[in-house]
């Protein structure tokens, strides 16, 4: 007699809910900013790693999970023009350059610290931080009659997200620069401060500075 194949649930362990890093759910995470909502990817994913398959696609990074995008920003050393108080802060963390496993562990540890301090889902706290740190206006230079002027322009949602994540990672590097604070602790503190709109947050204060300069250039 031919054996009947067992149901898939009996042959393999299939979780009822896929959680990011096996700990945090994205089902109840809410994005209030209508312009950022289409670009903040919160798909349930156990391991936020796409192996760079969106790298050569136009606007492909919009499909990358928001946690992975934070990991990618943490992993970078930053360009030569990114300075805080005259120092290249992110140069202190070259051990994370192009080492995604280590960057993944740093972000995971930061999320644990956020959960312990706030008692809330760290992914939701990250979304709040991004919404508060994403500038709406910036300046660009235009030339009229051989004279260059700075004018205010609106920022696209995808760039708003990029700037917010970059400044969060840069602010974390600044906080642990020449201190005993670990990078994970600094990252957790920066995200919490930005989520609370605290002026001590580098990302939030940078957003206010960018918008203030843009307002004066109207």
Curated annotation (Swiss-Prot):
Keywords: Ribonucleoprotein, Ribosomal protein, RNA-binding, rRNA-binding. One of its GO terms (cellular component) is small ribosomal subunit. Coiled coil: none annotated. The keyword Ribonucleoprotein applies. Pfam families: Ribosomal_S7 (PF00177). GO terms for molecular function: rRNA binding; structural constituent of ribosome. One of its GO terms (biological process) is translation. Part of the 30S ribosomal subunit. NCBIfam families: PRK04027.1, uS7_euk_arch. Belongs to the universal ribosomal protein uS7 family. One of the primary rRNA binding proteins, it binds directly to 16S rRNA where it nucleates assembly of the head domain of the 30S subunit. Is located at the subunit interface close to the decoding center. HAMAP family: Ribosomal_uS7_A. This is Small ribosomal subunit protein uS7. The gene is rps7.
